[in-house]
Each structure stands twice: as structure tokens, then as C-alpha cells.
Swiss-Prot record:
Covalent S-S links between cysteines: C31-C37, C35-C44, C309-C334
Species of the source: Gallus gallus (Chicken)
Stretches in topological domain Cytoplasmic: 548-647
Extracellular-side segments: 29-526
Protein name (database record): Leucine-rich repeat transmembrane protein FLRT3
Example GO molecular function: fibroblast growth factor receptor binding
LRR repeats: 58-82, 83-105, 107-126, 127-152, 154-179, 181-197, 198-223, 225-246, 247-269, 270-293
Region (Disordered): 620-647
Domain (LRRNT) ranges: 30-62
Location in or out of the cell: Cell membrane; Endoplasmic reticulum membrane; Cell junction, Focal adhesion; Secreted
Lineage: Eukaryota, Metazoa, Chordata, Craniata, Vertebrata
Bilayer disposition of the protein: Single-pass membrane protein
Leader sequence segment: 1-28
């Protein structure tokens, strides 16, 4: 039997006890009472704190202090001792200066939504390993940034200064910056020297500033050889910027400016560019070949521009038709001239561009009558009008007629009501789908007023709804293949019609017309109508019987209650109701008399009428029921009831 020395046994016992107590010693690290600690993550956010609590564990790596009321005086000096902290979230607090006493090795600092005005070298030099700095929504201005404030931050990659008070780009930014956001400031000028050292910059956002072409130097972006994304949205540019870095630029955003022309060399050498957006500008045409160097373009957005589809834009149609399927071009819709407004540029044929050298005259054809629709004429847009030919009346519905060389679609329209138009069509060849578009005519349309839809090839009609009453509309259809590419040599078939006027389609008239148009499904009268008619006839018969019975009994009753009319022709009964005489009207049996009243009993302008009914309680009038049949029955005296004083 092997014996273990007692000393060795005691040593191993102590080691076991120490190992058992080790987890408890780690778990016993303190956590501020107002916070919650979870393995390096310290949550002290949303607690209305005015200062950072003390006693934060030394193993903390992420401090969540956002949405409090912490000010600069509330940052304790002991915070510098937390050497493992890498991320601090101090946004939405009450800081008015760049904070000090921050941990030295912090890499990501969020200070947005404070009121920070100044950025000094002393505050930034304490955090030399900073990689991301978020200062959005503060009050930083160009003069409040100390010269050389960032010279020790050689690891800074992201700098966000959106929505501040900057008028220029800060000087002396580190060369290591890869993303710079300066959107929604007051920047009006950018010198060529302010960005020349940022050779590692990949993303530059300058949206919502006051930049125009005079405030941009010709070579301001030239040295940004690693730039992949440039955004100049919501500025005041009148022309697309030139001399852009073409080595790596992939995204260019120029929408919501005042760009009215594009220099021919604006996009030269941008062979890596795959997304270009110039929507919401004032472009009416493009110089030929402006997109020739865009070898990798896949997304081109040109929405909401007043494109004039004249001869200068014919090359655009040819370029669009030569693009591969992967290229997505949006927004090239004609706004002028009038004859092609609302049509896609890629759908136009050569004759519609008004190029005199290529223009060929198309003979006007005669309208084909149709028995189902009103008299319809030809569509004036797709033909060349001769001086001696009158323009068709736009207040009627028209049927399209095209050259007999190519007749793919024939469209018919009919105004159903003040807000709806029924469209039907016939196709000469089988097709998978058709594109249907409509636009209100008679005025310069607002951007986006053209409505489009895709209908399947097996359909032959469509109902347009929610239209304006008594308004002209243009309707166009284009055949589509299964690959969703429009036929390159096919002109859209268009037609113009008008919704019905309001006076012709009031609710009652419309209902009656619809009822007249809709035939009965069965020739027999519905059972409900038969029952309703029978009930009405029975009710009328009963009502007539009751009226006859009342009339007969009333006549017999009035013969027993006849009274003398002799005195009523010249007495003062009628006068009593108009002169306001101070008298009493007394009726005894079949006669009556006026009894004067002394002035001391009743005031001067008053009278009192006492009615004394006959002892037998009978009516005084011969036919009392006849008075209820009219509002102006006449007495024997010839005076209407409205002129008598009733009691």
C-alpha cells in the first residue's frame, strides 16, 4: 500500500480550494448600481444620468452611455484607466466640447446629437488609436476646429460630420481617412488643396450643401485615386463635374441639382462606373457619345428630366437598343415635343425625331368605320399633316390608323363614364405581353403623371379608372417580347380620347343609361317585382276605400250640423282678425256677436277672443275635412284662410 505524505495532501487540498474559488472571484467584480454589466458590455444608457458612474469594471470593452444628460464635467478622470474599452456610445447627451479623460485605446467613438462646438488637439491626442469618429448633428464649424487637431490620429478611417455648421472642408485631415461624410452643412466652396492629401479616401458624401460649379475647382477630385463613391445630391450644380477620378469610381450620384447640360467629356475614362444617377434635374438632351466610356454601367437613372425628343436625342435611342440585357436604364421618357410626350425614347422610330435628312412623309389614311363605336378618325401624331387637311376633333374618340406597311395593334376606345374609359385592341401577331400607358393631355404634365402597366398577351381589353371628367387622354400600346425588350423597329400605337362631361353623366342619368344598356338575363319579370307590384295595388285599393268611407260619413254628418250663413256676409268677424279690436267674440248656438271691452280691462293694442262652443258640441263648419286637403282653402266671403284670424 502506497502512503501519501501528509504535507503533500495539504498542498493539493489548498490548490483545489483555490481553483474552486476562482470563478467566484471573477464574478465578484463590481458593477455600478445604475448600470447593468454583461461580460465587458456596460449598459448605462437611458437613465437620465448627468455624469458617468464610477466603479466601472476594468474588463469593460463597450460603454453604452447614450440618451442621458451627461455634460463635460460629468466625465470622471478615472475613466482613462479603462485600458480595454474600444467602443463608447455617448450620443444624445449634453456635451458642448469634445470630451476629455477618455480611455486611450478607444477605437470607435459616437458623439452625435450633442452640442459640441470645438475640436482641439489636446482632446484628440488623448485617443491616438481612434478609427471611427461620429460627430453628426453637432455645432462644429470650420473655424472651431483647431489647426492640426487630427495630426496624431493616424489610424482614423471614418469621420462623420453630417449636419453641422461647416462652410469648408476642414484642413489637416489624416491621410488614412477612407470615408468622409459632410452632408447637410453649408459648404459652398472646395479648394483643390483641401482634398489632395486624402489619397486613401473611398467614399465622399457632400449631399445637401451649397455647392455650384464655380465653387468646385476643376481638379478638386482628381487626386482621389481610390475614390469608389461620390455623392453630390441636393446641391446647386448646373453641369456635371469633370475631371473625376476614373481609376476606381463605381458610384456617382448627381440627382436633385439644377444640371441642364452635361459636358461631352464629363464621364470620360470612368470605365469602372456601374451606377450613375442624374434624376430630378433640368436635362433636355445629351451630347452624343457621352456614355461611350461607361463600359461597366449597369444602372443608369435619369428620371424626372424634361427630355426633348428631337433630332439631338436620336442617338440615345440607337444606344439604348444596342445595350445588353444587364443594363438597366430608367427615366428616358419624352416630355416634348407634344406629339411624342409620354412616350419612351427607345420606343420611337426615326420619323418621330424630326431629323430632316432622315424624315420621310407618311401618307394619311382614312378612318375605318366601326359599328360598335362612334365615328373615329386617324391619330395625327404618327403621320405628317398636309396643309389642306384639318386636324381631327379632339372631343371625340379616335381609332388609330397606321401605315399599311406595319399594322401590329389596332386600338379601340370608348368613354364609359366621367372617370372611366374602356380600351380594347386587336393584334395581328401573337405576343407574350403588351405595355399600356396613358397620359392626360392639354397641359404640360407634371413629372410622374404618366401611368404604365403590363398586360398579358391573352387579354384584349382594359378599363382605365380614376380619370378626370371631360379631359383628353392619350393612350399608347407597345408589343413586348418574352425577354422584356421592346421591338426595336415597332412604333407605339397611340390613340386620343376624352372622358364624358359631367352634365351628361349625373348619377341619375348614368344609372338609367346603364340599366338601359344591360339586357335582362331572363325574359320573365323577377318574382320580387311581381310581389312588390301586387302589394302596392292592394295598398292603393284599401286607401281608396277608406277615403270613400270617410267622405260619405262626413257628408251625412255635416247635414245635421248645418247653420245659418245669413249674418256672416256683413258682420265684423273677418275684421276682428285684422284690426286688433278690443272686443270679445261670442258664439251662441248658430249666431255670434261682438261685445266691446272697456279700455281699462285690456291694453290698447291687445284683444281677447273667447270661443263659446254650442251646447251640442257640434262643428260650426259644414265640411271640416275639406280644409285639410289644401293650405289655401277659401271661405264664402272669398277671402283666403290666411287672411282670417283663427281661434
Amino acid at each position: 500500500m502506497i502512503t501519501v505524505p501528509w504535507s503533500v495532501f495539504l498542498i493539493w487540498t489548498k490548490i483545489g480550494l483555490l481553483l474552486d474559488m476562482a470563478p467566484y472571484s471573477v464574478a465578484a467584480k463590481p458593477c455600478p448600481s445604475v448600470c447593468r454589466c454583461d461580460v465587458g458590455f456596460i449598459y448605462c444608457n437611458d437613465r437620465d444620468l448627468t455624469s458617468i458612474p464610477t466603479g466601472i469594471p476594468e474588463d469593460a470593452t463597450n460603454l453604452f452611455l447614450q440618451n442621458n444628460q451627461i455634460n463635460n464635467a460629468g466625465i470622471p478622470s478615472e475613466l482613462k484607466n479603462l485600458r480595454r474599452v474600444e467602443r463608447i456610445f455617448l450620443y444624445h447627451n449634453s456635451l458642448d466640447e469634445f470630451p476629455t479623460n477618455l480611455p486611450k485605446y478607444v477605437k470607435e467613438l459616437h458623439l452625435q446629437e450633442n452640442n459640441i462646438r470645438t475640436i482641439t488637439y489636446d482632446s484628440l491626442s488623448q485617443i491616438p488609436y481612434l478609427e471611427e469618429l461620429h460627430l453628426d448633428d453637432n455645432s462644429v464649424s470650420a473655424v472651431s476646429i483647431e489647426d492640426g487637431a487630427f495630426r496624431d490620429n493616424i489610424y482614423l478611417r471614418l469621420l462623420f460630420l453630417s449636419r453641422n455648421h461647416l462652410s469648408t472642408i476642414p484642413w489637416g485631415l489624416p491621410k488614412t481617412i477612407e470615408e468622409l461624410r459632410l452632408d447637410d452643412n453649408r459648404i459652398s466652396t472646395i479648394s483643390e488643396l483641401s482634398l489632395q492629401d486624402l489619397t486613401n479616401l473611398k467614399r465622399l458624401v457632400l449631399d445637401g450643401n451649397l455647392l455650384n460649379n464655380h465653387g468646385l475647382g476643376d481638379k478638386v477630385f482628381m487626386n482621389l485615386v481610390n475614390l469608389t463613391e461620390l455623392s453630390l445630391v441636393r446641391n446647386s450644380l448646373t453641369a456635371a463635374p469633370v475631371n473625376l477620378p476614373g481609376t476606381n469610381l463605381r458610384k456617382l450620384y448627381l440627382q436633385e441639382n439644377h444640371i441642364n447640360h452635361v459636358p461631352p467629356n464629363a464621364f470620360s475614362y470612368l470605365r469602372q462606373l456601374y451606377r450613375l444617377d442624374m434624376s430630378n434635374n433640368n436635362l433636355s438632351n445629351l451630347p452624343q457619345g457621352v456614355f461611350d466610356d461607361l463600359d461597366n454601367i449597369t444602372q443608369l437613372f435619369l428620371r424626372n428630366n424634361p427630355w426633348h425628343c428631337g433630332c439631338k436625342m436620336k442617338w440615345v435611342r440607337d444606344w439604348l437598343q444596342s445595350l445588353p440585357l444587364k443594363v438597366n436604364v430608367r427615366g428616358l421618357m419624352c416630355q416634348a415635343p407634344e406629339k411624342v410626350r409620354g412616350m419612351a425614347i427607345k420606343d420611337l422610330n426615326a420619323e418621330l425625331f424630326d431629323c430632316k435628312d432622315d424624315m420621310s412623309t407618311i401618307q394619311i389614311t382614312t378612318a375605318v368605320p366601326n359599328t360598335l363605336y362612334p365615328a373615329q378618325g386617324h391619330w395625327p401624331v404618327s403621320v405628317t399633316k398636309q396643309p389642306d387637311i384639318k386636324t381631327p376633333n379632339l372631343n371625340k374618340n379616335y381609332r388609330t390608323t397606321a401605315s399599311p406597311v406595319r399594322k401590329i395593334i389596332t386600338i379601340f376606345v370608348k368613354s364609359v363614364s366621367t372617370e372611366t374609359i374602356h380600351i380594347s385592341w386587336k393584334v395581328a401577331l401573337p405576343m407574350t405581353a403588351l405595355r399600356l400607358s396613358w397620359l392626360k393631355m392639354g397641359h404640360s404634365p407634371a413629372f410622374g403623371s404618366i401611368t404604365e402597366t403590363i398586360v398579358t398577351g391573352d387579354r384584349s381589353d382594359y378599363l382605365l379608372t380614376a380619370l378626370e371628367p371631360e379631359s383628353p387622354y392619350r393612350v399608347c400600346m407597345v408589343p413586348m417580347e418574352t425577354s422584356n425588350i421592346y421591338l426595336s423597329d415597332e412604333t407605339p400605337e397611340c390613340i386620343e380620347t376624352e372622358t364624358a362631361p359631367l352634365k351628361m353623366y349625373n348619377p341619375t342619368t348614368t344609372l338609367n343609361r346603364e340599366q338601359e344598356k344591360e339586357p335582362y338575363k331572363n325574359s320573365s319579370v323577377p318574382l320580387a317585382a311581381i310581389i312588390g307590384g301586387a302589394v302596392a295595388l292592394v295598398a292603393l285599393a284599401l286607401l281608396a276605400l277608406v277615403c270613400w268611407y270617410v267622405h260619405r260619413n262626413g257628408a251625412l254628418f255635416s247635414r245635421h250640423c248645418a247653420y245659418s250663413k245669413g249674418r256672416r256676409r256683413k258682420d265684423d268677424y273677418a275684421e276682428a282678425g285684422t284690426k286688433k279690436d278690443n272686443s270679445i267674440l261670442e258664439i251662441r248656438e248658430t249666431s255670434f256677436q261682438m261685445i266691446p271691452i272697456t279700455n281699462d280691462q285690456v291694453s290698447k293694442e291687445e284683444f281677447v277672443i273667447h270661443t263659446i262652443f254650442p251646447p251640442n258640441g257640434m262643428n260650426l263648419y259644414k265640411n271640416s275635412h275639406s280644409e285639410s286637403s289644401s293650405n289655401r282653402s277659401y271661405r264664402d266671403s272669398g277671402i283666403p284662410d290666411s287672411d282670417h284670424s283663427h281661434s
